[in-house]
Swiss-Prot record:
<keyword id="KW-0808">Transferase</keyword>
<dbReference type="Pfam" id="PF04560">
    <property type="entry name" value="RNA_pol_Rpb2_7"/>
</dbReference>
<comment type="subunit">
    <text>The RNAP catalytic core consists of 2 alpha, 1 beta, 1 beta' and 1 omega subunit. When a sigma factor is associated with the core the holoenzyme is formed, which can initiate transcription.</text>
</comment>
<dbReference type="InterPro" id="IPR007645">
    <property type="entry name" value="RNA_pol_Rpb2_3"/>
</dbReference>
<comment type="similarity">
    <text>Belongs to the RNA polymerase beta chain family.</text>
</comment>
<dbReference type="Pfam" id="PF04561">
    <property type="entry name" value="RNA_pol_Rpb2_2"/>
</dbReference>
<protein>
    <recommendedName>
        <fullName>DNA-directed RNA polymerase subunit beta</fullName>
        <ecNumber>2.7.7.6</ecNumber>
    </recommendedName>
</protein>
<dbReference type="Pfam" id="PF00562">
    <property type="entry name" value="RNA_pol_Rpb2_6"/>
</dbReference>
<comment type="function">
    <text>DNA-dependent RNA polymerase catalyzes the transcription of DNA into RNA using the four ribonucleoside triphosphates as substrates.</text>
</comment>
<keyword id="KW-0548">Nucleotidyltransferase</keyword>
<dbReference type="GO" id="GO:0000428">
    <property type="term" value="C:DNA-directed RNA polymerase complex"/>
</dbReference>
<keyword id="KW-0240">DNA-directed RNA polymerase</keyword>
<dbReference type="GO" id="GO:0006351">
    <property type="term" value="P:DNA-templated transcription"/>
</dbReference>
<dbReference type="GO" id="GO:0003677">
    <property type="term" value="F:DNA binding"/>
</dbReference>
<dbReference type="InterPro" id="IPR007642">
    <property type="entry name" value="RNA_pol_Rpb2_2"/>
</dbReference>
<dbReference type="InterPro" id="IPR007121">
    <property type="entry name" value="RNA_pol_bsu_CS"/>
</dbReference>
<dbReference type="InterPro" id="IPR010243">
    <property type="entry name" value="RNA_pol_bsu_bac"/>
</dbReference>
């Protein structure tokens, strides 16, 4: 059943309801939503529950009337069973998949690098068909990764997300093209299965109907019909109405079924001797055997729907039938003839039209469950081969299911999927919103999907059928634009994998509260009105003509009697991140795209602050993201501390909720939870107990509300640069905590075992001051780059010992052995405080990789204050880099002395057309100061306030406001409220009704000559921090071949002096500078050392030598068999020295320089 039907929720408050204890937000929403936002993680959790056949999924399916469907694992075992041997005398079948308890908790899995998984067992039955003997056993099928409550998987200790894939649905697709030469209309059709060979029919420019089987050469379509057993008379009887098919039949020379079969066999298997039997088997296997060909339920459903077959009957056949092929050919010839309708075999009239491949009726989602199911299918088919072989080799009497089955291929297939598939991704954990959006992502890439290079503009473009299903705004910038999208807020996925969106039913011009979920195909058959169409209290449309949309995105005005459905909510078409942009309706789409994407890059701040101006989506997003702690049962809070909250439930049970304290996220941001309830407080089920990162009182809080002035300032905020007040640095307003993980292991080497120890050779006591007796740094130590975190020594290669050394070794034992210092040190450019240490040892029975005896992890936290070069952004795509941080006293200030926090340039607004930021600034000021609308003596309101609800007529200062997308505050309401703001304590109103204020220059005290827009804007600190980007090098690793420094911060590389920079030097004739840059500062190996020596000894810099890259060029030319000679200015040949220069080695050794630097060298090695 495709149309789900739910009864509407009782009349909702205009703010998002459904979560007890939610913070108060004054909302401008005027449209009542009859439906709550569905669970935002259902896309992931429902699909996985279907795969494992969970009880909750079965109950939901039964409620929907889908009782015929079995779970994903059951399906696949039924598909595989029975496995028979080659003679058919033995068979093995599988059934009843079930799981044991998971082996470890999610926290333990993350800590110990384990996979969060449960053991999977199935019942295997071996039947000996000769004797009738049945042996049944429960067989272990490996550990199966389980989904956490948050919709993620933990694989080897890291959290991963499986992204849903958008693919072309199996089915039958008709296409139209025009022949370039004759300008004739050509039509074709593809029958695309879930798996198996493609079948294509087409009408060519000579008006013959042809068929291509499995992408091979074209043949007349009548050959296929004859091969299926049709006679010429039967073909003429069925297709007599079509001239082109009769013409094709005349041109077809094959005499009967046998000849047609052989003809097809020759085309499919050229070079093999054709026989009737092999040809018959080949054709049957290609399309009519379910082992080789599978339309899947969805493909059968699509074919039946398109061709009008078996309507109203349950979906059974997963292979093609003869009737499918005949109906497809008839549809094609009628389409070519220009017919608009055809009568299907069942007597049903179906429209004849070409298909739009980018329509969401023809694209479906492969969700997590299906992706994992496909992977298990691969593993099981590999296992099937093994079982068959073992059936033939093992003794029949001794065979048990256990001896036949090898689970390795299945386990390997699952591991391969989670570890390496393009759709199993390292979870984006910058903040709760980024994680939530990642789980709701839809990707057209991946195995069986499109590739970046081949995807054209049509696939990437916004399509009318995306409305309410995929967000038209949120997609990446760059090569993946349009290929990766995000599920809309209200959308859900039906059992066939098509995305549905809810609509309110309209009956006889009256809007009811009945909600139906429609797929894109079904929506095309109806007339749909917008959510903001005016409706009276009884649900009747108040206007005579209402704007509606029809199939293909056409909009027009119609009378209310013609309307079938109405949108559920104004925010129905956008995704969660987009729905969190206030005044989205005033932003240009390109900037809204950046705004939605940049919210995902927000860094959690030390103190989160919910936005003054929100959209009402903040609460649901934060709760569903799963980073806040929610009460399971109603009760009373018994105990609260920084680490846990205990709740005594009304049924007498106690539950203790543990907080995550300063944990490291995947992206190195800090995930910290803190309680927001008090002892003795009563809490409802579903109420937020503790805030996580980027949340305040259970609401998403990605940034800070800052007092902003929009004005140019001395040119310092030119080109989107931003000017900040020093107050934000001093008071840690935009300070964030970042946690880095450093890891070192002690292994067994050929020369002996490495050892983690405090006893490091040639190191002063100062360096070891913070190490404990094991050689591991203490928690709380302040560290900077180069400091030792964990001491480790590695045995050096030993030469033959002298008698004296042997004596010393005998007396003092191992200590006299030569060891190298290979300690873990803080990388270049990093500082911080040690906040955690984890030690894993083989002696403590910890599970470690082979050859590793001990593993130490050190967590270093950095407190990063805001600084010049960091990137800030608003929610409207208005991003910029901090150009200057001014002392608080130099910032412009309001007439009451309040200094501005942040100055943005006016030039960043007009051409970008993101006016939402200006409206947000004004509304932010209104919310901060509070307001009181003046009511006349007779109780009448001003005109602009007519539509405002009663509770909106006055509000105190610091009131949080919700202005939902497409249903928010109007301009006249903003103007009116700006004129009704509350005065400050001196009785003065700082900002006039036009939103502008007189500002004074902090340096001179003089007023600026023009009024300036002032208000509160929500500013986000982005993940692009200058500390992660700035980089400098003196000496470091060199490339092994060219001997030039490596590039990039990660490799501790140098700055490339490139072609254009050389031109600049040449243009100025700076010959010696240029020579120095190209030799001794780059890859003149000998010169580098000699210069270093000269500097140390205070001598003059010697002449540069030959660069290494020049020698490489000579070698490359010689490898092409060219005899290359280097001549001096007087024509004499110069010998290129290739050998080792002993003087050079000696000089380098004296100076303590290691010349064997290459790519493999790490920064730590170089510091030694």
């Amino acid at each position: 059943m495709l149309e789900g039907r739910i009864l509407a929720v009782s009349s909702q408050t205009k703010a998002v309801s459904g979560i007890p204890g939610a913070p108060k937000r004054v909302s401008f929403a005027k449209i009542r939503e009859p439906l709550e936002v569905p669970g935002l993680l259902d896309l992931q959790t429902d699909s996985f529950e279907w795969l494992i056949g969970a009880q909750s999924w079965r109950e939901r399916a039964a409620a929907r009337g889908d009782s015929a469907i079995s779970g994903g694992l059951e399906d696949i075992l039924a598909e595989l069973s029975p496995i028979e041997d080659f003679s058919g005398s033995m068979s093995l079948s599988f059934s009843d998949p079930r799981f044991d308890e998971v082996k470890a908790s999610t926290d333990e899995c993350k800590d110990k690098d384990m996979t969060y998984a449960a053991p999977l067992f199935v019942t295997a039955e071996f039947i000996n068909n000769n004797t009738g003997e049945i042996k049944s056993q429960t067989v272990f099928m490996g550990d199966f990764p389980m989904m956490t409550d948050k919709g993620t998987f933990i694989i080897n200790g890291t959290e991963r997300v499986v992204v849903s894939q958008l693919v072309r649905s199996p089915g039958v697709y008709f296409d139209h093209s025009v022949d370039k030469g004759t300008e004739k209309d050509l039509h074709s059709v593809k029958v695309i299965p879930g798996r198996g060979a493609w079948l294509e029919f087409d009408v060519d420019k000579r008006d013959t109907v042809g068929v291509r089987i499995d992408r091979k050469r074209r043949q007349p379509v009548t050959v296929l019909l004859k091969a299926l057993g049709w006679t010429t008379e039967q073909i003429a009887e069925r297709f007599g109405f079509s001239e082109i098919l009769m013409a094709t039949l005349e041109k077809d020379n094959t005499a009967g079924t046998d000849e047609a079969l052989l003809d097809i066999y020759r085309k499919l298997r050229p070079g093999e001797p054709p026989t009737k039997e092999s040809a018959q088997t080949l054709l049957e296997n290609l399309f009519f055997k379910d082992k080789r060909y599978d339309l899947a339920r969805v493909g059968r459903y699509k074919i039946n729907k398109k061709l009008g077959l078996n309507t109203g009957q349950p979906i059974v056949a997963s292979t093609l039938t003869e009737e499918d092929i005949v109906a497809t050919i008839e549809y094609l010839v009628r389409l070519h003839a220009g017919d608009t309708e055809m009568t299907a075999p069942g007597g049903v009239a179906v429209p004849v039209e070409v298909d739009d491949i980018d329509h969401f009726g023809n694209r479906r989602l492969r969700t997590v469950g299906e992706l994992i199911q496909n992977q298990i299918r691969v593993g099981l088919s590999r296992m099937e081969r093994v079982v068959r072989e073992r059936m033939t080799t093992q003794d029949v009497e001794a065979i048990t299911p256990q001896t036949l089955i090898n689970i390795r291929p299945v386990v390997a297939a699952i591991k391969e999927f989670f570890g390496t598939s393009q759709l199993s991704q390292f979870m984006d954990q910058n903040n709760p919103l980024s994680g939530l959006t990642h789980k709701r992502r839809l990707s057209a890439l991946g195995p069986g999907g499109l590739s970046r290079e081949r995807a054209g503009l049509e696939v990437r473009d916004v399509h009318p059928s995306h409305y309410g299903r995929m967000c038209p705004i949120e997609t990446p910038e760059g090569p993946n634009i349009g290929l990766i999208g995000s599920l809309s807020v209200y959308a859900r996925v039906n059992p066939f994998g098509f995305i549905e969106t809810p609509y309110r039913k309209v009956e006889g011009g009256q809007v009811t509260d009945q909600v139906d979920y429609l797929t894109a195909d079904e929506e095309d058959r109806h007339v749909v009105a917008q959510a903001n169409s005016a409706v009276d209290a009884n649900g009747h449309f108040t206007d005579d003509r209402i704007l509606v949309r029809r199939k293909g995105g056409e909009v027009e005005f119609v009378s209310s009697a013609e309307i079938d459905y109405m949108d559920v909510s104004p925010r129905q078409m956008v995704s969660v991140a987009t729905a969190m942009i206030p005044f989205l309706e005033h932003d240009d789409a390109n900037r809204a795209l950046m705004g939605a994407n940049m919210q995902r890059q927000a860094v959690p701040l030390v103190r989160s602050e919910a936005p003054l101006v929100g959209t009402g989506m903040e609460l649901r997003a934060a709760v569903d993201a799963g980073d806040v702690i929610v009460t399971e049962k109603t009760g009373v809070v018994e105990e609260v501390s920084a680490d846990y909250v205990t709740v005594m439930a009304d049924d007498g049970s106690r539950k203790t909720y543990r907080m995550r304290k300063f944990a490291r996220s995947n992206q190195g941001t800090c995930a910290n939870q803190r309680p927001i309830v008090d002892e003795g407080q009563r809490v409802e089920s579903g109420q937020v107990l503790a805030d996580g990162p980027c949340t305040e009182n259970g609401e998403m809080a990605l940034g800070k509300n800052l007092l902003v002035a929009i004005m140019p300032w001395e040119g310092h905020n030119y080109e989107d640069a931003i000017i900040l007040s020093q107050r934000l640095v001093e008071e840690d307003v935009l300070t964030s905590i970042h946690i880095e993980e450093h890891e070192i292991d002690a292994r067994d080497t050929k020369l002996g075992a490495e050892e983690i120890t405090r006893d490091i050779p040639n190191v002063s006591d100062e360096v070891l001051a913070d190490l404990d007796e094991r050689g591991i740094i203490r928690i709380g130590a302040e560290v900077r780059d180069g400091d030792v975190l964990v001491g480790k020594v590695t045995p050096k290669g030993e030469t033959e010992l002298t008698p004296e050394e042997r004596l010393l070794r005998a007396i003092f034992g191992e200590k006299a052995r030569e060891v190298r210092d290979t300690s873990l040190k803080v990388p270049h450019g990093e500082t911080g405080k040690v906040i955690g240490i984890r030690v894993f040892s083989r002696d403590d029975d910890d599970d470690l990789p082979p050859g590793v005896n001990e593993l130490v992890r050190v967590y270093v936290a950095q407190k990063r204050k805001i600084q010049d070069g960091d990137k800030l952004a608003g929610r409207h795509g208005n991003k910029g880099v901090i150009g200057k941080i001014l002392p608080q006293e130099d910032m412009p200030f309001l007439p009451d002395g309040t200094p501005i926090d942040i100055i943005l340039n006016t030039h960043g607004v007009p051409r970008r057309m993101n006016i939402g930021q200006i409206l947000e600034t004004h509304l932010g000021w209104i919310g901060k100061t509070g307001w009181n609308v003046q009511i006349a003596g007779d109780g009448s309101r001003p005109d602009w306030a007519e539509q405002l609800p009663e509770e909106m007529l006055s509000a105190p200062s610091d009131s949080n406001i919700a202005t939902p997308v497409f249903d928010g505050a109007k301009e006249d309401e903003l103007t009116g409220l700006l004129g009704s703001t509350l005065p400050n304590r001196d009785g003065e109103v700082m900002v006039a009704s036009d939103g502008k204020a007189t500002l004074f220059d902090g340096r001179s005290g003089e007023p600026f000559p023009y009024p300036v827009s002032v208000g509160y804007m929500y500013i986000i600190k982005l993940h692009h921090l200058v500390d992660d980007k700035i980089h400098a090098r003196s000496t470091g690793p060199y490339s092994m071949i060219t001997q030039q420094p490596l590039g990039g911060k990660a490799q501790f590389g140098g700055q490339r002096f490139g072609e254009m920079e050389c031109w600049a030097m040449q243009a100025y004739g700076a010959a010696y500078t240029l020579q120095e840059l190209l030799t001794i500062k780059s890859d003149d190996v000998v010169g580098r050392v000699k210069v270093y020596e000269a500097i140390v000894k205070g001598e003059n810099i010697p002449e540069p030598g030959i660069p290494e890259s020049f020698k490489v060029l000579l070698k490359e030319l010689q490898s092409l068999c060219l005899n290359v000679e280097v001549l001096s200015s007087d024509g004499a040949a110069i010998a290129m020295a290739d050998g080792d220069d002993e003087d050079l080695e000696r000089a380098a050794a004296n100076l303590g320089i290691n010349l064997s630097r290459n790519e493999a060298a790490t920064v730590d090695d170089l510091a030694n």
